[in-house]
Amino acid sequence: MMPAAHGMRSRFFGSRLARVVSLLLLAMLFGAPIAWSQRQRFMLEPNVPYDGRYTFVRLRYTQGYRMAWSADYPQMERNFMTILGDLSTLRLHKKASNVHVLDDPALNHYPIAYLTEPGYWMPTPQEAEALRRWIQKGGFLIVDDFYFDRQWDVFEKAMLSVLPTARIVPMDVSHPIFNAFFHIKTLVGMTHPATPLAKAEYLGIYEDNDPSKRLQVIINYNNDIGDYMEWSGEGWYPVNFSNDAYKFATNYVVYGLTH
């Protein structure tokens, strides 16, 4: 395991930025014109070649509801990478991101991947095996944007086809992922953008089902931090929800890069 989150924070981020980050987020959400939007026709952008910089990776599943994997793409990536790039010293691609199918060998270059709308995700046996190997080799999976029992049941079946012996367990705010950069004091408060009845829950899967070992998968259930980040400049959602989405996403990336 890599050094503790507190030590890694000083490596990647300036402490002064951390103290004033709330003001920065409020100031930056978002003056720049939005170049891409879901109002425009969907277009899959070309992947950037691996060059050692952090690249946001989204997973494209080939079975399930058509195009569900692409929710919030690519504006969410642009907004998040802008925030992360301005607040950190990470070398990253601000204006480019990658989309990989689950069994793409190129995925092995990247330590973190994002999977959205898993309530429609049905991996093939080949995809499940490839994703399992990626996770077991050290990959960190972020799962986002699904709510209520029906979507949970689909996700759980798919996830257990990837990690058959996995136990999906509730996360506690004391876990290092919630203090990887931002100090998140509570996991209560956010809801899924589609309905305030869906109260956010955070769950995880640990290596060997052992909470003392590496967290392999973080699950945002009854939440959609991608949507909050995508539309953070439009005024559709409460600013505190957009800010919280950036905080969770930033912590996930820092944790994934340091564990």
Residue ranges and their predicted role:
Residues 20-32:
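Bacterial N-terminal signal peptides
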